[in-house]
Regions:
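Catalytic alpha-helical scaffold of carbohydrate-active enzymes acting on polysaccharides/glycoconjugates
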Residues: 1-124
Length: 124
């Protein structure tokens, strides 16, 4: 027996959920992966990785917003609280345009399971 889905708009049989990750790392930190193919010596700041990690708030999210505006699509944007602190204009614009804002920790390098209960409460 074929199952019928009749509650999608216009009888459509497929829906797509657009989710954008708007992530930042703590100051001076970079993602654990890097566009660099050669490992840096211990203690050397990964300036390329840091710059790469800042691209999302400075350029990437604005490009996504233009695409979403042009296609009249709303998205769920998972963002770190630090991203909201660093890029408040972007977050205000996302909210004003009707995109859903979803909490996604404080920063990407903060891993809650590695914290004590007290440290976790402080973060929250």
């Amino acid at each position: 027996m074929e199952k019928s889905i009749s509650n999608w708009p216009d009888g459509r049989k497929l829906t797509v959920m657009v989710t954008i990750m708007f992530e930042v790392w703590s100051e001076g930190k970079a993602p654990p992966y890097s566009p660099m193919t050669t490992s840096l010596k211990s203690g050397t700041p990964d300036l390329l990785g840091i710059s790469w990690s800042q691209y999302g708030g400075k350029t990437g999210i604005w490009r996504f917003m233009r695409i979403l505006d042009d296609t009249d699509i709303n998205a769920t944007v998972c963002l770190n609280a630090k991203a909201a602190e660093l890029f408040p204009d972007a977050v205000k614009r996302l909210h004003a345009r009707g995109h859903e804002i979803a909490g996604h920790s404080y920063t990407q390098d903060l891993v809650l399971p590695y914290l004590t209960l007290e440290e976790e409460k402080d973060v929250i």
